[in-house]
């Protein structure tokens, strides 16, 4: 599934290397902490990228996009639950609009994905943090972390999109447009 990251050089890299090893052994909290580091950016995110890049095995990435209210979350929930029920290890990155007050995700699609959560899929909601294009800037790095941790496929649900929100096409192997 995944190997051992290269030897750490300083304290921050040691923490990241330990998190990567723990996450790769199946610890979901460690995986969530790595995703948080990537989402926050900066040097810790760079250390995560460096540690996980050689471990990524090429998980299938499926982008799920469409207009607001078209059923993206329902489709994502059902697909993740079905994949988990078939013995796969799906992960979901649900990208939501950002709250103008907190900067966090407004809708929290993760809360509505009951079937997938019950079946054992890994689900992470995140905010766009004002980035246009339907995704957050951290999504490619987060996909790499999930891939390195052995999740396959990785489902990326975008915010409700218009004609200019096409970032998912560059991040996914397959794009599903829900109409």
Task: Identify the function of each model-found stretch.
Residues 15-26, 31-62, 67-70, 75-178:
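Nucleotide-state-sensitive switch-loop elements of NTP-binding domains
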Residues 1-23:
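Long, basic/Gly/Ser/Thr-rich N-terminal segments
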């Amino acid at each position: 599934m995944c190997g051992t990251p290269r030897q750490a050089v300083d304290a921050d890299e040691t923490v990241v290397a330990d998190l990567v090893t723990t996450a790769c052994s199946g610890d979901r909290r460690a995986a969530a902490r790595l995703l948080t580091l990537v989402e926050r950016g900066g040097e810790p995110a760079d250390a995560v990228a460096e540690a996980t890049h050689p471990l990524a095995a090429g998980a299938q990435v499926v982008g799920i996009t469409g207009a607001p209210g078209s059923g993206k979350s329902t489709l994502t929930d059902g697909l993740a639950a079905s994949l988990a029920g078939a013995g796969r290890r799906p992960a979901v990155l649900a990208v939501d609009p950002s709250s103008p007050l907190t900067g966090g995700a407004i809708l929290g699609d993760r809360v509505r994905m009951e079937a997938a959560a019950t079946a054992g899929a890994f689900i992470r909601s995140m905010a766009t943090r004002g980035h246009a294009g339907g995704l957050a800037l951290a999504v490619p790095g987060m996909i790499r972390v999930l891939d390195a941790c052995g999740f396959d496929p990785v489902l990326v649900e975008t915010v409700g999109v218009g004609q200019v929100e096409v970032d998912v096409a560059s991040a996914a192997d397959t794009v599903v447009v829900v109409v």
